[in-house]
Amino acid sequence: MNSIYEKLTTCLASVREKTDFVPETAIVLGSGLGDYAEQIKIETTIDYKDIKGFPTSTVPGHKGRFVFGYVDSVPVVIMQGRVHYYEGYPITDVVLPPRLRGMRGGKKLILTNAAGGLNTDFNPGDFMLISDHIATSIPSPLIGANIDELGERFPDMSEVYSRRMREIVKEKADKLGIKLREGVYVQLTGPQYETPAEVRMCKILGGDAVGMSTACEALAARHMGLEVCGISCITNLAAGLSDKKLNHKEVQETADRVAKQFTELITAVVRAV
């Protein structure tokens, strides 16, 4: 058995020992957005450290646990914090969670993150619906022997982010009076924030927001046939676009400021998808 797939099956067995809850939709909460998990009707929680072989998050604002429960009547699993490539994990560990959720039975995945705005029309506190991504700065999680149990060798990526789900997000944001941007997300490795020159590069490539997660997870999820939606919270302007130095505290403060809108939007989307 492929060693990566063997690790996945070990983690899945560990989760099944702890709960038989089967979610319809999975949600990944990015930096500063983790409090949403406290708003749902919680059935059970599992800390990442209690899952055999599972990577654990080391970043402030990422609690590091699965929260199983209901958004109204919709069964969901929320990943309260994620692991990042810059934490030193192999890319196959970084995408282990979305793969695990696919193996668990869920077919819809909502990815959220905190991101820096590249588009000068964006402001801190805006939400950006991800229409596509650029992830050439990080290794593909599909490199190596293909895991046939997960998906085909050469998966199509012409619609990584579901058009159907994007239309739902736009409709719900409009009804809630939430200003929603749409654009291309660029994933860089981190943990350092991007340089002004890197920001110019990302803008030339067509990027609207930049961060250190999400694209690799979306790629792995699409390989498995999951329907994916991505939403960025623009927590700061990227380096060189303002006079302020970048810091993680600003990310948390901006996320706190828009927490109510974030809760309303994600809840409405989960009900509809």
Model segments located where?
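Polyanion-binding loop/helix "lid" in catalytic or ligand-binding cores
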Residues: 150-161, 173, 187, 199, ...
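Metabolite-binding pocket within alpha/beta catalytic cores that recognizes anionic/polar moieties
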Residues: 1-157
